């Protein structure tokens, strides 16, 4: 742990005191455990306190069942100045599936919390936009592919549905759709521009057209067989994905 990270943990203890359940490490990264209701305040403080000025770099969930009846949430922050890492975590026990959203205070969490809802069925209460992100509208209701009970070879049905794009209206405003099919090896992506002449007034992006259960396939592979699958995740990132794996 760097001196900067050590100072950050001490600062959070001084500020939030008993709201912090415990501290530890995830590898060499400081790990602070909180109850769900205190997440928004602590996450916001990390991002906006002048002495910290952290950036939310990643947010993810883990389904620990059947070993423990628990879902665990992680929030990885990079601190200003030296880029030290700081990790927050909380958990939902038993049948709990709702946790407080940090998006209203930390806007970078917006897509992460939507993705977690789609893949795990965990709902970020207070999120301003819980439209589907990874699960496109044809996915059956209640289908969450990273829950432990979802089998890697499960055949899903298909339902009809419409994705409601955000609309911008006004004199001289036009929508310009681009994609999802593009030339070359670039992955599919739909970009919907709202323009008024040359200025772009709004852009809405839809990705995840090729979600195909890769995470579940990894669960069934040995460590040595994983790189071959990692290379196939994305056509324009085969080397970087296998290297990270």
Residue ranges and their predicted role:
Residues 1-203:
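Terminal low-complexity/charged segments
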Residues 174, 178-245:
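Active-site- and interface-proximal helix/loop "cap" or "latch" segments in soluble metabolic
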């Amino acid at each position: 742990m760097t001196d900067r990270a050590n100072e950050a943990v001490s600062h959070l203890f001084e500020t939030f005191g008993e709201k912090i359940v415990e501290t530890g490490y995830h590898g060499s990264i400081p790990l602070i455990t909180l109850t769900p209701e205190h997440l928004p305040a602590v996450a916001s403080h990390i991002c906006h306190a002048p002495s910290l000025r952290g950036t939310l770099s990643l947010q993810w969930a883990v389904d620990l069942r059947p070993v423990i009846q628990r879902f665990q949430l992680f929030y990885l922050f990079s601190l200003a100045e030296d880029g030290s890492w700081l990790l927050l975590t909380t958990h939902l026990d038993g049948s709990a599936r709702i946790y407080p959203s940090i998006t209203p205070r930390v806007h970078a969490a917006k897509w992460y919390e939507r993705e977690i809802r789609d893949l795990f069925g965990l709902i970020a209460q207070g999120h301003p936009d819980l439209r589907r992100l990874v699960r496109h509208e044809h996915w059956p209701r209640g289908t969450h592919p990273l829950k432990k009970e979802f089998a890697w070879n499960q055949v899903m049905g298909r339902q009809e549905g419409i994705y409601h794009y955000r609309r911008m209206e006004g004199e001289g405003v036009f929508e310009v759709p681009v994609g999802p099919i593009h030339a070359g090896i670039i992955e599919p992506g739909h970009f919907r521009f709202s323009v008024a002449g040359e200025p772009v007034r709004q852009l809405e992006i839809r990705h995840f057209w090729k979600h195909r259960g890769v995470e579940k396939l990894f669960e069934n592979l040995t460590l040595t067989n994983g790189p071959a699958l990692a290379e196939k995740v994305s056509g324009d990132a085969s080397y970087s994905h296998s290297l990270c794996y």
